[in-house]
Amino acid sequence: MKRSRWSHSGSSTARLLLIGVLFASCSTAILGAQRPPINSAGGHELRGTTFMPALECYDPYGRPQKCLPEFINAAYQLQIESTNTCGEQNDNHFCIQTMNQNHKNCEFCKYNDHNPSFLTDLHDPQSPTWWQSETMFEGIQHPNYVNLTLHLGKSYDITYVRILFRSPRPESFTIYKRTSESGPWIPYQFYSATCRDTYSLPDSRAIRKGEGEAHALCTSEYSDISPLRDGEIAFSTLEGRPSGINFERSGELQEWVTATDIRITLDRLNTFGDELFGDSQVLKSYFYAISDIAVGARCKCNGHASKCVPSTGMHGERTLVCECRHNTDGPDCDRCLPLYNDLKWKRSTSTEVNECKACNCNGLADKCFFDANLFNRTGHGGHCLDCRENRDGPNCERCKENFYMRDDGYCVNCACDPVGSRSLQCNSHGKCQCKPGVTGDKCDRCDNNYYQFGPHGCQQCGCDSGGSHQNTPACDTETGICFCKENVEGRRCNECKPGFFNLDKNNRFGCTPCFCYGHTSECMTAPGYSIVSVTSNFNKFKERWTAADLNQREVDIKYNQYSRSIGTTAQGNEHVYFQAPDRFLGDQRASYNRDLKFKLQLVGQVANTGVSDVILEGAGSRISLPIFAQGNGIPDQGVKEYTFRLHEHHDYQWQPSQSARGFLSILSNLTAIKIRATYSVQGEAILDDVELQTAHRGAAGHPATWIEQCTCPEGYLGQFCESCAPGYRHSPARGGPFMPCIPCDCHGHADICDSETGRCICQHNTHGDNCDQCAKGFYGNALGGTPNDCKRCPCPNDGACLQINEDTVICTECPKGYFGSRCEQCSDGFFGDPTGLLGEVQTCKSCDCNGNVDPNAVGNCNRTTGECLKCIHNTAGEHCDQCLSGHFGDPLALPHGRCDRCSCYEAGTEQDEQSITRCDQVTGQCQCKPNVIGRDCGECQPGYFNIRSGNGCENCLCDPVGSYNSTCDRYSGQCHCRPGVMGQRCDQCENYFYGFSSEGCKPCECDESGSKGFQCDQNGQCPCNDNVEGRRCDRCKENKYDRHRGCIDCPDCYNLVQDAADLHRAKLFNLSQTLDEIARTPVTNDDEFEAKLKAVQEKVAVLAQDARDNSGDGGQTYAEVIDDLHKHLDSVREHLVSADKFQADANGEIDRARQNYTILDQITENAKKELQQALDLLNDEGAQALARAKEKSVEFGQQSEQISDISREARALADKLESEAQFDLKNAKDAKDAVEKAHQLAKSAIDLQLKIGTELRSEVGLELSHVKQSLGTVVQTSKEALRKANEVYDTALTLLNDVNRQTQPEIDISQLKKDAVAANERADELLKQITELSNSNGELFADFETEQELTEALLKRAEQQQLEDIELLERAKAAHDKATKAVEQGDNTLKEANNTYEKLAGFQSDVQRSSESAEKALQTVPNIEKEIQNAESLISQAEEALDGANKNANEAKKNAQEAQLKYAEQASKDAELIRRKANETKVAARNLREEADQLNHRVKLTEMDIFKLEESSTKDDNLVDDAKRKVGQAKADTQEAQKQIEKANADLTAIKDELENLKDINTGDLDRLENRLATVEGEINRVNLTGRIEKYREQRTIQKNLIDKYDAELRELKDEVQNIGLISKALPDSCFSRNRLEP
C-alpha cells in the first residue's frame, strides 16, 4: 500500500475517522472504511493493502453469515491514464511556487520524471514522487482541462477517494465514477470556489433528508490556494447523505458507492492573479501536480464473498472476481447458482444472510429460475429448466407428453406410430393402441403374415409356414412377399429354388440342394429310404475305434467294461484324437444336414481348446471346428453331450468354408472322423455313445425324404448320375463321378472305350487312349480314320521315327552316340566314322578328355579324331592331360584336373614369347633371372639387391671393413654400416668421425672452444687453436690457462714452476739414462754394498731360525701363512674382477639411461600430439553432442531429458578439459622425475668416482642391490597403476550404462525408445573412441615406465621426492574420482522435475562458473607445455652431464688399473682432476635441482586449480542431484496419473460393456452403475491431467530458453578452445637451445 500523509489535512482525516466509527457501529458494507491507510507495502495479490480484515462467510459453527472482502487501497500500483503529462512531447520548463515571488526555482521536466505511474506507487515522504502536468505557459487552464482515469478492473464498493497534491490544490475539479466499463461517467463530487459559476451547482456539503441522495454535491471547502504543497482532499462517498446510517436498506446508496472506474477532471488552476500580466516565468509556475491518489474500497461481492481472486476471462485477460459463497455466482456474486433459485436473490445483510436455496429438481436438472407465481402458490419459487430423462414439471416430477414412466422411474418416449396407432399416447407400460393387422409396442409395423401398412391397418399374406423363415409366416409389409428360408422361393414360400428339392418344415434351410455329382440341377425325393443312425455304444468292446496324434502315430485305447466306454491318454503334450471305424466312413451323403453326436469326459485335465477339435476328412479335403462350436460347451471332468450339424452354412463354423457341393463331396467319400481326446499335457479322455444320423434304402423306420433321385441328362446313368452311358467316358479319364461324360473318340480305329479311363481298344498299328498316334516303329497320320494311316519306320532296330513332311522321315530313337535323320552321324561328345566315308567303318565312341571339359558344352572334341577342343580347369593337350603354360599341378586328378597359376614375381622371373611367366608344371618352381632366388623368384640372393630392375639382382659390393655383413637393402642397395660409417657401400667415415676400421669410425669430439673446426684428421687429431694442444684440443699448453679465453699466459710467478718442472725433467732424463746403463751393464763393484748384503743375510738366517723355533709348538708355519696370503690375494683378485664386471654393467646402464632420455623426447612430442587430438575431439564431439540434445528437445519437448542432456554435456566438457589437464600434468611430472633422476644419476656418478679403489667393489654391489629393489618397486607400482586404470575404465563403463538406463517422463514412449537406441549407438561410438585414445596413451605410458625401470638402479636418492609428487597427483586424482562418483550418484538418483525453474536458474550460473573453471584449466595448458619444454632442456643438459660422467668413470677405471700397476702418482693427479671436474658437475646438478623445485612448485599451483575445479564440480552435482530428484518425482507422478487414467478407462469400458450386456433393466443395476460412473469421474478429475500438461508445457518453454543460453555459452567455450589450439600450434615442437655442462 502506498504510504500516505494525513497531517496536512487534519480536518478531513478527523472526518473520515468519525464516519468510520459511525459505519462500524452500524455494521455496514464498508466497515472501517474511513480509517486512514497505514504505512505498508503488503496486501492483495494484485494490489492494495489490507486496512481491515475480511469477514468470513460462515461462523465457527458452519452457519452462514454476511461476509465482506478485506478493505484495501484499490488504486495501489494501478496504471492511471493521463491526458496531459509534462515532458511527454518535449522537456518542459517549470518553476516551483513559493511565497517569495522575487525568486523562483525553475527546472526542466522530463516524461520519466513525473509520469502517471507515480500517482499510485509507494508513497514515501522522505523520497517523494508525483505526477505533473504541463504549465499554464503551455495552455493548461480553463476551459482546457486534464483527465486522470483509473480503471479498477472490477466493481468496488467505494468508501473514499483521497488525493494528495504536490502543487496547490485546483480551484475547480471533479471526481467521476462509472459503474461498468461501457457505462456513462457519473459525477461523484465537484470541488470549486465558484460552484455556481463553474458547475451551475450550489455550494453544499450535505443532502437534506427526503431528497434524492444519489447525486453529486459541489463544495468550496478545498479550493483555497493554500497550502502551496501537500494539500489534501478526502472525498467520502456517504458523507452528507442521510440514508448512510441505513446503508443496508438503501438500494440507492448501494448503487451510489459502486464503481468500476474513477476519473478526476482538473478544470481550473488556483492562482495569485499574476498570470494576467503574461510573464512566462509566472505562467510556468502554475501547473497540476499530484503525489498520491488512494481509493479506499472493498471488492463488491454483495455480502456473499470474503475475498476476491484473480481469474482468466474468456479473452485471456486477468481480472478480479469474487470467490462466491452462499450458493451465489457471478463476478460480484450478484446472482444465484444455476440450481439455487428457489428463493429470489438478495444482497446479504447483517440481519439476513439471504443464502440462495437449491431448487428441488429431483436430480434431473442442472439449472432453474425463480418463478414468482409458483412461489406465491407453493412457497417455493424454483422452477426447473431443461429437465433430463424426458421429465417435465416445476420439479421434473412427471413425464413429458407422449412419454410414459417405466417401473424404474425413467420416462421413455411412447413413439407411437401415427399411422398404425389409434392414439399417440401409450399406456403405463409403453404399449400403443394398434389398428387391425398392426403390431408392435409402437404400432409401427404389420403383424406377422400381414402386409401393406396403411391408415386402415394391414392385410394378411398367407405364407407357407414350412417354407417361411424360422417356420413363422411373415412377409414384406409393402409387397406382401413372404420371407422364405434360404433355399425356398415363391410369393408364399411354397416352392424349392431351382437345384433344390424336398421342402421340409424341419429343415432350417427349407430345401436340400441337388447333389447329382454336379451333372444336373433337377432332382426329387428318392423313394425307399428310411432314417437310421450309425452308433457306437461300446457295450462289449472298442468297436474298432482307434486313437492317434496329428502325425498319425498310434496311441493305445483302453476299454472300460464297467462304464462301457473307451479312453486314451497322451504321453506328452501331443494332441490325441479318437478315430472312427469304417462303418462311419465311406459314402455318407445321407448324413448331410444331419447330426454327429457323442459324449466326452476329461480326466484330471483342464481343456485348452483349439480350432481343430473335431475333424472330417474326405475327397482330399479336410474341415474342422472347435469343440465349443455350434453352442457346445468346453469339455471338463463331467460327462458332456456334443452335437454337430453337418452343413456348410457359416453359422455351423466348419473351416475352411465350403460350398454345398464341396461339403457333399467330402461326405461322399468320408475317409476319417476325428474327435480330439486330450487337451493338456498327458491328458486323458473318455468317449461314449457316438451317433451319426444317416439314411439307408430299405431299412425300417421313418422315411428319409432328403435323399435325392436325379434326372440325368444324355450320357449319364445312375440314381445320382454318377456313371456314363455306353459310348461315353468321364473327362478327364479316371476323374471319378464328378467329371462330365463325353462321347468316346477313337478316330475310327476302335468301336468301344472304357467308361472310366476312356481308353480305346486300338487297331491298324495305332495306339493311345484315343488311337490318335501311330504305334512305335510306325509313322503316318493316325487321325485319317483309315486302316492304312500308319507305315513302318526306316530306322535301325525298328526304332521310332517322325515324319516331317511328305518326303522326310527322321529317326527319333538313335542309339547312344549317334544322331542324324537316319542315325548316320556321331553325336556331340563322340567320334568315329559310322558310314565309312573316310575309310573303314568305325563305331561312335565317347571322347576321352579326362573330365576337363564342360559336359554341358557343345563341340568339346573333334567328332572324327576325338581330339579335345575345349579344355577347362587350366588344362591343355589332345586329351586335356597337361597344364596350360604358366600353370602347374595334376591335370589328371579326380574328379577334374587341378592346375594352378604359377605364382611368380614378374620382375624376377623369366618370361616366354607371349610374356607369360614360366614355372615347372609339376613343382611350380619359377624360372628365375640371374641372382634371384625363391619359389616365386621374389628375392635377391644374399649380397644382392634391386630385383625391381627386371634384369635380375645387382651385387651390393658392401665394404667388408665398414659394414656389418655383405647384405644390403633389397631395394636401395644401402649396406648396413658400422657406427660412424656412411655411404651406400659403407666405405667412408661420417663427418666429424675418424679411424675407418672394422669397429666403425670414432667421433672426433673436438672441443668447441679449443678447436678451429669439428672435423679431425684420419688419426683423430683436431685442428687446435694457438696455445692449445691435445688430440681433442681440450687443454692449454704448459704455462697457459683458461681455454675459453684462448689459453692465455699464466702469471709470471708460474715461470718459477716452469723452471722447476724443466729441472725435474732433466733429472728424470738423467735417471732414465742411468737406469738404462745399469740394465745394459748389471755388474757392480761396491765393497760396501757387499758388506751390507752379508749383514742382511745374517739377519735373515736369525729370523729363519726364530721362525722355526716359534713353529715348533704346533702353530702355523710361515709357509702356511704365505699360502693363506696367496689365497686371500686370489680372493681379492676375484672380487676385483667382479668389480670390473659390475662397473661395466653400470656403464651399460648409463648408456641405456642416455637412450631413455632420447625416448623421453619422443614421449613429450607424442604427448603434444595427444593434447591436440583431445582438443580436436572437444571441437567435434562436443558440438555434435549439443546439437543432438537440441534436436531431441525440439522434437519431443521433454524438459527433463534436455536438462539431463545439457548437464551431461557440460559435465563431459569439464571432465574432458580436466582430463587433458591431468594428462599434461602427468607429462610434466614425468619430465620432472626424469630431471630429478638425471640429477641423482650425475651425483651417483660423482660419488662413484670419489670411491674408486678399495670402495669400488662394495659401491657397485650396493648399487646393484638398489637396482633389484627399485625394479621390484617399479613392477609393483606398474601393477597398481594398471589396476587403477582398469577401475577407472569399469567406472566409466558403469556410468555409461547408468546413463543409458535413465528414462524421462515422456508421453510418446515409443519415440523415446527410438531416441534411446540412437543415443546408445552414439554413446557406443564415443566409448570406442575414448577406449582407443586410452589404449594409445596406455601404450605410451607403458613404454615410458619400461624405460624408467632401466634407470631406477642409480636413482635411489630421488625416491623421496618422487613419493611426494605421487602423493600430490594422487590427491588430484582422488578429487577427480570424487567428482566422477558424485556424477554417478546424481545419475542413479534421478527422481524429480516439478517446480525446477528456481533450481535451474541457479544451475545456469553454476554451469557458467564451471565453464570458467574449465577455461582456467585450459589456460594452464600453455604453461604446462612450457614446463615440458624446460624439462626437455634440462634433460638434454643432464644427458650431456651423463656423457661426461660416463667418460670420467671409464677414465677412473683405467686409472685404478694403472694404480694396480704401481702408477700411483699419475693416478693421484688424475683423481685430483676428476674431483675438480666432479665439483663443476655438482654445481650444475644443484642448478638442475633448483629448477626441478620450481617445476614442483608449479605442479602444486596446478593442483590448487584442480581443487577449485573439484569444488565447482561438486556444486554442479548438488544442483543436478536436486533437479534429478524432481525429474524422478515428475516421472512417478506421470506414471501414477497414467495408472489412474488407465484404471478409469478400464472402469468406463466395464460400465459400457455391462450396460450393453444388461438383459433385464432394473433401478438397482442402474444406480450401481451410476455410482461407479461418478467414482470414475471423480478419479479422472483428481488426476488433473489438463493442469499437469499445461504446467509441463510452461516448464518446457522455460527449459528451451535455458538451452538457448547454454548453446551461446558453449559457442563461447568453443571459441576459447580454438584460441588455445592456436596457442598450442604456435608452441615450438622441441627446445633448440641445449646447453652442455662443462666436462
Curated annotation (Swiss-Prot):
Keywords: Basement membrane, Cell adhesion, Coiled coil, Disulfide bond, Extracellular matrix, Glycoprotein, Laminin EGF-like domain, Repeat, Secreted, Signal. Residues 299-358, 359-413, 414-460, 461-513, 514-523, 710-743, 744-792, 793-846, 847-901, 902-955, 956-1003, 1004-1049 form the Laminin EGF-like domain. Residues 1087-1109, 1144-1247, 1306-1627 form a coiled coil. It is found in: Secreted, Extracellular space, Extracellular matrix, Basement membrane. Residues 533-709 form the Laminin IV type A domain. It comes from the Eukaryota. GO terms for biological process: animal organ morphogenesis; axon guidance; basement membrane assembly; basement membrane organization; cell adhesion mediated by integrin; endodermal digestive tract morphogenesis; extracellular matrix assembly; midgut development. GO terms for cellular component: basement membrane; extracellular region. Residues 1050-1609 are annotated as: Domain II and I. Glycans are attached at residues 147, 376, 669, 862, 965, 1070, 1156, 1394, 1479, 1584. InterPro entries: EGF-like_dom, Laminin/Netrin_ECM, Laminin_IV, Laminin_N, LE_dom. SMART domains: EGF, EGF_Lam, LamB, LamNT. Residues 1-33 form the signal peptide. Laminin is a complex glycoprotein, consisting of three different polypeptide chains (alpha, beta, gamma), which are bound to each other by disulfide bonds into a cross-shaped molecule comprising one long and three short arms with globules at each end. Binding to cells via a high affinity receptor, laminin is thought to mediate the attachment, migration and organization of cells into tissues during embryonic development by interacting with other extracellular matrix components. The alpha-helical domains I and II are thought to interact with other laminin chains to form a coiled coil structure. This is Laminin subunit gamma-1. It comes from Drosophila melanogaster. The gene is LanB2.
